[in-house]
Amino acid sequence: MSGGSTGERPFSDIITSVRYWIIHTITIPSLFVSGWLFISTGLAYDVFGTPRPNEYFTQDRQQVPLVNDRFSAKQELEDLTKGL
């Protein structure tokens, strides 16, 4: 079976075209800037529901929230999350 043409443009033709670079000189930096803003504004914490670095430990709870006994894990989790 010989290797036939699939009708697609060769990759070398794509990356040497002016249209490719006009499009990508806009999209690649804009993706970088939007990602940087997503992280630096703290929106990533809100979207994914993770606590901010200053919210891991409250004034009331300074210990690390670990579950020690797997058989009473539900009760331990309720005790740990009571103040949240």
Curated annotation (Swiss-Prot):
Pfam families: Cytochrom_B559, Cytochrom_B559a. Disulfide bonds: none annotated. Heme binds at residue 24. Keywords: Chloroplast, Electron transport, Heme, Iron, Membrane, Metal-binding, Photosynthesis, Photosystem II, Plastid, Thylakoid, Transmembrane, Transmembrane helix, Transport. GO terms for molecular function: electron transfer activity; heme binding; iron ion binding. The chain crosses the membrane at residues 22-36. It is found in: Plastid, Chloroplast thylakoid membrane. One of its GO terms (cellular component) is photosystem II reaction center. With its partner (PsbF) binds heme. PSII binds additional chlorophylls, carotenoids and specific lipids. It is a single-pass membrane protein. InterPro entries: PSII_cyt_b559_asu, PSII_cyt_b559_asu_sf, PSII_cyt_b559_CS, PSII_cyt_b559_N, PSII_cytb559_asu_lum. One of its GO terms (biological process) is photosynthetic electron transport chain. Its cofactor is heme b. The keyword Membrane applies. Heterodimer of an alpha subunit and a beta subunit. PSII is composed of 1 copy each of membrane proteins PsbA, PsbB, PsbC, PsbD, PsbE, PsbF, PsbH, PsbI, PsbJ, PsbK, PsbL, PsbM, PsbT, PsbX, PsbY, PsbZ, Psb30/Ycf12, at least 3 peripheral proteins of the oxygen-evolving complex and a large number of cofactors. It forms dimeric complexes. NCBIfam families: cyt_b559_alpha (TIGR01332). Belongs to the PsbE/PsbF family. This b-type cytochrome is tightly associated with the reaction center of photosystem II (PSII). PSII is a light-driven water:plastoquinone oxidoreductase that uses light energy to abstract electrons from H(2)O, generating O(2) and a proton gradient subsequently used for ATP formation. It consists of a core antenna complex that captures photons, and an electron transfer chain that converts photonic excitation into a charge separation. This is Cytochrome b559 subunit alpha. It comes from Thalassiosira pseudonana. The lineage of its organism: Eukaryota, Sar, Stramenopiles, Ochrophyta, Bacillariophyta. The gene is psbE.
